[in-house]
Amino acid sequence: MARLKVGIVFGGSSEEHAVSVKSAQEVARNLDTEKYQPFFVGITKDGAWRLCDGPGQDWENGDCRPVVLSPDRSVHGLLVLEQGQYRSVRLDVVLPVLHGTLGEDGATQGLLELSGIPYVGCDVQSSALCMDKSLAYVVARSAGIATPDFWTVTGDETIDPGRLTYPVFVKPARSGSSFGVSKVCRPEDLATAVESARRYDTKVLIEAAVVGSEVGCAILGNDPDLIVGEVDRIALSHGFFRIHQEEQPENGSENSTPVVPADIPTEKRSLVQETAKAVYRALGCRGLSRVDMFLKEDGEVVLNEVNTLPGMTSYSRYPRMMAAAGLPLSEVIDRTLSLALTGKLR
């Protein structure tokens, strides 16, 4: 039986480029190459697309050829430039391993919709919705899901610091990981935090701090057939959780440790999982996502954010939560590809 041709797209021009490369390395290690034939498409930080041998740390200096993903449905794949001529490579499915702007905000998904190639993960609408935390909060609230109190600042707008109750978190509304995020405890520090967030997005989100534990839940599937991973909890020694901000995240964080399974009572774990599924459905997610939440002392679960293409590195939360539930990364990859092709969990 012929192997299915899988385009694995990684890298990208967002601030999460390096994390994407590491995620792609883990995907490459865990892909069943007896079943799938991978075509690795790396996107440089400058936005150039290259067909390469694999997502090694020095992949750009290897045997790379210029490539584009054709929006022409008759091509159904890649156009590779070789010796001054383009040749086409028909793909059966695409697995985006991209994080942040232009990777999980609906842009890449729109190109894939034009191409007609099935792809892993959320569609254009849900990708864009989840990327904009303020819009995700609006939709979640309409579905009866608790969110932090929040305000948005766009363009040259300002906000009266005296309106807020501190502490607050200031963050780019449409950015991944913890880039540009600040905890503000005094009104006089608000303007600086807003300017820091504007380095990453023209729309800034200001959230009232939620007192509680940070918890997460990995989800795999299409509604109504969903698999939920074990819940995790972020154990903090001080400060706040800054994912992917360390120079060597493989060696752990200086202030946080993910605990999987979360050391919380069974009934609270179940509530977190049910809330995560409600968020997933309300925001129209499909394929996979990681839902991050807060668990308050009174038992209320509050939405933090949704990652539609969560990290797949050796230290990432999503694969750890799924592994704790009995699904190794190789199985997760296989099931997401099956979902993209058939719409059903096998």
Curated annotation (Swiss-Prot):
User: ATP-grasp domain: from which residue to which, for each copy?
Assistant: 137-338
SUPFAM superfamilies, per this entry? Glutathione synthetase ATP-binding domain-like, PreATP-grasp domain
Per the UniProt entry, what is one GO biological process? peptidoglycan biosynthetic process
Q: Which Gene3D superfamilies match?
A: 3.40.50.20, ATP-grasp fold, A domain, ATP-grasp fold, B domain
The entry's Mg(2+) 2-binding residues are E305, N307
- Indicate the enzyme's highest-level EC class: ligase
* Residues involved in ATP binding: 163-216
Cite a single GO MF annotation: D-alanine-D-alanine ligase activity
Protein topology in the membrane: Peripheral membrane protein
Compartment list:
Cell membrane
Q: Kindly list the positions annotated as binding Mg(2+) 1.
A: D292, E305
Q: Return the EC number.
A: 6.3.2.-
The family note in this entry says:
Belongs to the D-alanine--D-alanine ligase family.
Cite any additional comment in the entry. S.coelicolor was found to be of intermediate resistance to vancomycin although it does not produce vancomycin.
Q: What is this protein called?
A: Putative D-alanine--D-lactate ligase
Query: Which organism is the protein's source?
Result: Streptomyces coelicolor (strain ATCC BAA-471 / A3(2) / M145)
